[in-house]
């Protein structure tokens, strides 16, 4: 059984009120008394009851972040950004991993564990637009991502279509004409893959280049292995291309590996760009050109909006914010000499 405040008071030989004063860092506690209480807390491995604390103050000082998969680098780096943004406001972050499973995504909004936090930052992957009416919980919610629009919750998202268009235009500006896509999802319209493919198509249309589905590789997941398998498929089919747009960085990394193994020079023979600006893309060989979708801004905006909603739950109608983006040219498109100096479009 977990230790209680009364247990701590008994072991320390002080009153319940004194233990409470120590835990809440009240100034008027003698050093010797504080030391006795802290020793008792350590001996009993006492953990504060966030639910009880919330009943007293109305707030727990914690927020929940629900993500599909921390094994995907983008979500791991997003979690880090949210934790950093929350810490600036004295908040702790509780992590829920849904596994991109519809049942678990629904459960996270109804979980008793939400009573341990003041709000939920939620990035669904299995739920879709048809589930917009199901986005509700007993605490304020801020949605992330591109699966659901128009719910009753605040929403922070990236500019997928303009950013993908800018990434494709970067390749076109370098003289590339046959740009393969790695990472499309069959039949998807709303969602990161569908929106980024739309941006790619818009860039081609703007330059009068016909869309060719024969150089679009469809996948189920967005891991390096999927990017590698998709590139193997393109090469095995004899597809002709001089550039690749990986719809995320891990897909692009898998594609680059297969291209190099097949004897292609990157970017000499095939230029490659990804999307997400993962930290590791600065250290790949070659370094990977990519799109920075504004991950830190997403995290900071989500925390700010959640705090505003916690303070005034019905203060304003649901808000939707799109973060800025920028194309980051590196060696995989412009070569080592030009990397870092090439102009980059920015979404405002």
Locations of regions flagged by a protein language model:
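N-terminal helix-turn-helix DNA-binding module of bacterial transcription factors
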Residues: 1-61, 337-348
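Periplasmic-binding protein-like
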Residues: 116-124, 180-183, 217, 238-248, ...
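Amphipathic helical "hinge" segments at domain boundaries
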Residues: 35, 46-111, 115-119, 186, ...
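Hinge/beta->alpha junction and helix N-cap segments in small-molecule ligand-binding domains
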Residues: 68-77, 95-104, 156-166, 182-230, ...
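Flexible loop/turn connectors
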Residues: 232, 236-243, 248-348
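Flexible loop/hinge segments that line or gate small-molecule binding clefts
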Residues: 123-166, 186, 209-210, 250, ...
